[in-house]
Amino acid sequence: MRRSIVIVIALTAKGFLHRHLLEKGNLVTALSLRICNSRAFSGRSDYRERLRSGLHSIKFNDALTLFCDMAESHPLPSIVDFSRLLIAIAKLNKYEAVISLFRHLEMLGISHDLYSFTTLIDCFCRCARLSLALSCLGKMMKLGFEPSIVTFGSLVNGFCHVNRFYEAMSLVDQIVGLGYEPNVVIYNTIIDSLCEKGQVNTALDVLKHMKKMGIRPDVVTYNSLITRLFHSGTWGVSARILSDMMRMGISPDVITFSALIDVYGKEGQLLEAKKQYNEMIQRSVNPNIVTYNSLINGLCIHGLLDEAKKVLNVLVSKGFFPNAVTYNTLINGYCKAKRVDDGMKILCVMSRDGVDGDTFTYNTLYQGYCQAGKFSAAEKVLGRMVSCGVHPDMYTFNILLDGLCDHGKIGKALVRLEDLQKSKTVVGIITYNIIIKGLCKADKVEDAWYLFCSLALKGVSPDVITYITMMIGLRRKRLWREAHELYRKMQKEDGLMPIK
């Protein structure tokens, strides 16, 4: 009876999987074959010893070399040994490589077992190749293998990965009809994927269905729902879900508490955030770096920078290492509070602790100095950014242009814009909006109008901000008719609606 699920698949996709594996040989397969062919038989290491010592920390290139050693061995290793290696490669997120290496195994005449089929199906699903995953399922069942709930779990995950949630639920119903019992992991996969896509109401329906089927939700189930509901502002529903969780005797974990602290902090309910922190300590739930980062972020958002610094000291005293998120949050907080020099001190601490700054780090400091009109200090930040191997992006240049325009240095801003254009950098509408606004602010409305009219020649379409900025400039010059005509053009020709 269970085989009925793949009769259609097996008939319609007959040979599809085999053709794919023959036709889609890629660089990884070529590389592995080249290594195999170039190595002398006597130089091989004993693959058995490597397998015995464990594969949890193996690197990709070493895994390929080990695969070649195994493929050259006489007699050939079993599919069980190959599966152990290929599962380790899959854990490195090298799914395409695993698919290619399975093709090589088939060429060597090594037959699949249940676990190798399940691994291959999982890799197809993670590469969003569901038709091949289903073909593989059909092939394995045709050969007499009974898929496990893990196999079906991979397929459900594959459907969710490409947002085919209805088919994921339909597959779960078919699994039940075939006598399998879906576990909480399968339902968690669907609920979490729905929450990630903002389809929380559907996720709540799945939760109801899950309970109806007698599957007990766990803390992972509730964490997905609570996190999404809180972040979407549906406090009433999220509180109800949290109560439901507690009523079922499911204890909140570090993820639950961190999510609550994060939301309360962002909403300015700092006392409640601290209350949640104290409660997790009382419940012997150990905070992690995400918990502390959430606390620091909430304090920084609301300008309590000294308290945020104290939390940083606490996490260090408890043996945690601040990461880029920790430091970036503090730097951003200081810059928002116009304490950019203090932000620079955090960057120095960050560098001392061996944590590399990223584009966000440097752009935040760069923007802080530009907004304060300290362009000399801003240039030093830019120099440090480049010397550390972090490349400025378009946002970096926009920060400079915006700062120059805000401080009445429109001439320098225009020179920088010209330099950008000469460097063949693609300049977008955001950059032109900054310059148009700067020209209007400097009472150079005619120049702004000329730039506005030349946008089409530059291959750039104006957006609502462009129109509104230009209309404000025209109205300041009391050019009412021109402003009104521009408003009509915005609505009729470009189909843009004004911002309320």
Curated annotation (Swiss-Prot):
The keyword Ribosomal protein does not apply. GO terms for biological process: defense response to bacterium. PPR repeats lie at residues 78-112, 113-147, 148-182, 183-217, 218-252, 253-287, 288-322, 323-357, 358-392, 393-427, 428-462, 463-498. Disulfide bonds: none annotated. Keywords: Repeat. Belongs to the PPR family. P subfamily. This is Pentatricopeptide repeat-containing protein At1g06580.
